[in-house]
A protein has these predicted regions:
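A broad detector of the eukaryotic-type serine/threonine protein kinase catalytic domain
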Residues: 19, 23, 140, 172, ...
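Cofactor-binding active-site loop characterized by glycine-rich and histidine/acidic residues
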Residues: 18-21, 33-158
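Thiamine diphosphate
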Residues: 79, 88-100, 118, 122-124, ...
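N-terminal capping segment at the start of a domain
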Residues: 10-27, 169-171
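Non-catalytic, mobile gating and regulatory segments of ester bond hydrolases
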Residues: 1-6
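Short glycine-centered, acidic/aromatic-flanked micro-motifs in structured strand/loop junctions
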Residues: 25-26, 109, 139-140, 168, ...
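General structural feature for long, well-ordered alpha-helical segments within catalytic domains
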Residues: 10, 14-18, 32-36, 65, ...
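Charged, low-complexity surface patches
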Residues: 11, 29, 75, 145, ...
Length: 222
């Protein structure tokens, strides 16, 4: 079991990795990567058993936060610590996750808005194959301006796809300005609840809150 002290230590190292990667590349999405550090560390170090053939699935729908994924993978010893190859041709560290180079993610993402639909596919596959696994889909709040997200949300609520955990990184910023200035999303909680979601708001940087809600979610299916 990962202690809070060790969790925080890993998160600090991941932050350093992210900054090193983006600094050496000369470009990258710093804010989007830093805003999901604790969540990604918890998923990779606690929530998911990568030795299980039928393990839970992770979909980083906001794929531009790939530096966080790589930073976590370095601390997990999945990737070696080499900060010189982010966004280089032929590198494992592409600007967006690419399963050809990195198979510890379950979807290669680039164009925003598609991840939740794929998570539904994994959720249905779990039922059809009679295998117990969940799908965790990390969405950006700016990404919610994509229409496909709401089609997927409608389907999840209507068909009761209960083994998909939809996680929204509500950091309130996108490329050049705030999400509200670009296209105000209104009350997200009420929107998702209207589709039949059970919505829980947490501080995504707190170990205790992440642990509580993800443990509760997983226990529903195991």
């Amino acid at each position: 079991m990962l202690s809070k002290k060790n969790f925080n230590k890993i998160c600090l190292e991941v932050r350093r990795n992210i900054i090193e990667l983006i600094y050496n590349a000369g470009s990258g999405h710093l804010g989007s990567s830093l805003s999901i550090v604790e969540l990604m560390v918890y998923l990779y170090f606690v929530q998911i058993n990568f030795n299980n053939k039928h393990r839970d699935k992770i979909i980083l729908s906001k794929g531009h936060a790939a530096p966080c994924l790589y930073g976590v993978a370095m601390e997990k010893k999945i990737l070696e610590k080499n900060f010189k190859y982010l966004r280089k041709i032929g590198s494992k560290l592409q600007g967006h996750p690419d399963r050809k180079f990195f198979n510890h993610i379950d979807l290669g993402t680039g164009a925003l808005g598609q991840g939740l639909s794929v998570a539904i596919g994994y959720g249905i596959a779990s039922y059809l194959q009679k295998k117990k696994f969940n799908a965790y889909c990390i969405l950006g709040d700016g990404e919610l301006q994509e229409g496909q997200i709401w089609e997927a949300a409608m389907y999840i609520g209507s068909k009761k796809i209960l083994n998909v955990c939809t996680i929204i990184d509500n950091n309130k910023f996108q490329n050049e300005m705030t999400v509200k200035e670009t296209l105000d999303l209104g009350n997200l909680q009420k929107k998702f609840e209207s589709f039949g979601f059970k919505v829980v708001k947490i501080n995504g940087h707190r170990f205790s809150e992440i642990s509580k809600i993800l443990t509760k979610f997983k226990k529903k299916f195991y």
